[in-house]
UniProtKB/Swiss-Prot annotation:
Organism: Wigglesworthia glossinidia brevipalpis
Gene name for this UniProt entry: erpA
Protein name as catalogued: Iron-sulfur cluster insertion protein ErpA
Pfam families (UniProt xref): Fe-S_biosyn (PF01521)
Lineage: Bacteria, Pseudomonadati, Pseudomonadota, Gammaproteobacteria, Enterobacterales
Cofactor: record remark: Binds 1 iron-sulfur cluster per subunit.
GO cellular component annotations of the record: cytosol
Binding site for iron-sulfur cluster: 42, 106, 108
GO MF assignments: 2 iron, 2 sulfur cluster binding; 4 iron, 4 sulfur cluster binding; iron ion binding
GO biological process, one term: iron-sulfur cluster assembly
HAMAP family tied to this protein: Fe_S_insert_ErpA
Protein family: Belongs to the HesB/IscA family.
Function: Required for insertion of 4Fe-4S clusters for at least IspG.
Length: 114
């Protein structure tokens, strides 16, 4: 398990609380909160957030006090220095990333380019 300070990655209190609630509701206690980046969206890359029980050799298990997050090595390089947050609005509730490495982002905050 690695410390979040190593990657200068931050998790807001809103995001931490939502992750805790999702994991508490999950019947499979082996699942962890995973963040990964894939090709897609309107800017080339998009953020993905899932509950996943599989942890691969190249994954990093990062501890934020009492919340663990799994991020694969390739995705992590795009997230260094970022802030993972959560918003709950009338029309939409979602996780999003404030990413200082992104050159452009879409208006919804789910995709970016480097």
């Amino acid at each position: 398990m690695e410390n979040n300070k190593l990657f200068n990655l931050k998790l807001t209190d809103l995001a931490k609380n939502k992750i805790k609630n999702l994991l508490k509701e999950e019947k499979n206690k082996n699942k962890k909160f995973r963040i990964y980046i894939s090709g897609g969206g309107c800017n080339g890359f998009q953020y993905n957030f899932i509950l996943d029980e599989k942890i691969n050799k190249e994954d990093h298990l990062i501890l934020f006090l009492d919340v663990e997050i799994v991020i694969d090595s390739i995705s992590l390089q795009y997230l260094i220095g970022g802030v993972v947050d959560y918003k709950e609005e009338l029309l939409e509730s979602c996780f999003f990333v404030i990413n200082p490495n992104a050159k452009t982002t879409c208006s919804c905050g789910t995709s970016f380019s480097i």
